[in-house]
Amino acid sequence: MSTLTDDDLVLEPIADGRDPSWTVTVTGEKAGTIDLRDEEHGTASVRWDVGAGDQATWTGARALRLVIDHAFDELGYTRVEARVPVDRMDDIRAGSIGGMRREGIMRGAGNEPDRALLGRLHDDPPATSREGFIALLNAGLPTKRVIAQGRLLDEQGRVLLCRLTYKKEWDLPGGVVEVGEAPAVGLVRELREELGVTVDVGDLLTVNWLPAWRGWDDACVFLFDLGRVDASYVDSMTLQPTEILGVEWCDAGAVREHGAAAAVELLAAVDAGDLPSYREAPRAPE
């Protein structure tokens, strides 16, 4: 098995065969170990132990680059992955600097820790290229859940709320925006899928940040004006039975009685007027 080198960093082989491993040395001093494990179907997993701290992070990243290149170029793997406990941030950083993208979190059962899943494919752009660098940064950035909802009124000024299959409170029509989808486009799609109607999206009324609540992560709600229609408009709707039990025109009293806490608070702010373009909703009672 080959000795792998990068200037003063040397990987000396310990074990050959199906699961090779190396001793990591820097300027002749042992820094730790790194090994590959065959996971079948063209995939290998990599593990390393070079300590903690900034210097260890850089050492781990350099060792990873050598081993990953060896896995692709010499051993014929098409994917190398690592499963790193989420509290080992130095190792997660080393994986990213070493060219591995953050792909998600693997939950740990019982006393096992949750683990960050890192991965690199043989045809990913080089980590030192512009495309590769952006891809690595993008994979590690947090994402924000986005919800698009619409305020649709009838000729009496009542607002449309949906009775839902998955919670007792009624809510505004709309839903979660898909990755890469514009909020207004997502609202049109959601109403077409769930209510069977195609709407014209008007002005943005506000962006409403919702804090985490009842096991749901925080989210940003884009509330759009859907205008006014005749109350009979609901007769043309075809409801998606897995999510929508029914729809109701609601005055302020009905909203307070049946609406989800976030919807009640938001609609009250809309009715009060002078709504800011961005607002933060108060934390609802659990």
What are these regions (language model features)?
Residues 29-37, 45, 149, 160-161:
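Conserved beta-strand in the GNAT
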Residues 168-169, 240-286:
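Nudix hydrolase/Nudix homology domain
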Residues 57-71, 93, 97, 183-188:
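Conserved acetyl-CoA-binding loop-helix of GNAT-fold acetyltransferases
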Residues 35-37, 42-53, 83, 170-175:
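Conserved acetyl-CoA binding element of GNAT-fold acetyltransferases
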